[in-house]
Amino acid sequence: MMGLAHLGGVGAKAPALSLAEAGRKLAEPVLDIRNLVVRAGSANLVDGVSLAVRPGETLCLVGESGCGKSLTCMSALGLLDDGLVSSGSVRLFGEETIGAPERALNRLRGRDVTMIFQNPMTALNPIRRVGQQIVEAILQHTDLRGRKAEARMEELLDQVGIPNVPRHKTYYPHQLSGGMCQRVMIAMALACKPKLLIADEPTTALDVTIQAQILRLIRDLQTELDLAVVFVTHDLGVVAEIADHVAVMYSGKVVETGSVDALFDHPSHPYTRALMNSRIGFGRVPGTPLQAIAGTVPSPSARPQGCAFSPRCALASASCTSTPGMVAGRGTMVACHHIGAGVSQ
């Protein structure tokens, strides 16, 4: 992970690996996705995505809306809507989930892997008290019963920073703020001490103060539980704060991936650089204007031939009509025909 101080400049030397970090690199992935394709009819919504996350690591999926980040996560849990078809390989703790029976998936969900969503108000049951909802998760996925389950619920609410637990556990979701509801969702997600937490833009609807508290909470819990975390976001400031590794997605594909330090120091894909140029910080010269990314993400059914970013890219050329493969950049892997070109942009 890197601190927000990194936003003011680039080029810092990466620190030496600690023993814990070196051990993670040798560990088997908790989540291992290879060549994932999600189709709706003839359109590939997710198109050949490969990524992995190991115990104690945070992988951030970054990109604009419609890039396939959330679908990739839903595929990992076998939660695709009817009519969507997936292929490739998604392994959770070494077990293949694509094509797995629902019973096997249910054994993993909630116990070994959990997910928190962008809007906790829609994820929580509006007619059940929040304490009851956490107890239900405990009863479903653990052997705790009665007062022991109740005590575990109270412990979790205290762990995520809910004040006056005896009072707030009796509240309904609408009686709590957005930040408090998100803390309840995190408590529910951690009820069974999972090994993998998937967080789908959990701080987008929160103000910056509450966002910082939630990010700090997730980091602290990750350290305590050795959690692997997949964090979906479009906010590069959040990425700088929590990520170990980053996968930049565009139009259903991963276009650049690598360690957070390598990607922020040496962004090689034009889309990655465009994302950074559209935000304050990230080595920007003071006083220079922000650069909006012209155009929009193409519809999966109307992608241009070759590189999907080429219609929005200042470096586009005739070679971009062929699909670029992943090649080595400056510390990252990049899907681009023009590696090294336009780095000063």
Segments and roles (model prediction):
Residues L4, S18-L19, G23-P29, P163-R167, ...:
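Short catalytic/signature loops enriched in Gly
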Residues V85-E96:
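Conserved ABC transporter NBD signature motif
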Residues T97-T114, Q140, G146, A262-P267, ...:
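ABC ATPase NBD coupling module
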Residues A191-K195:
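A short, proline-enriched helix->beta-strand linker immediately N-terminal to the Walker B motif
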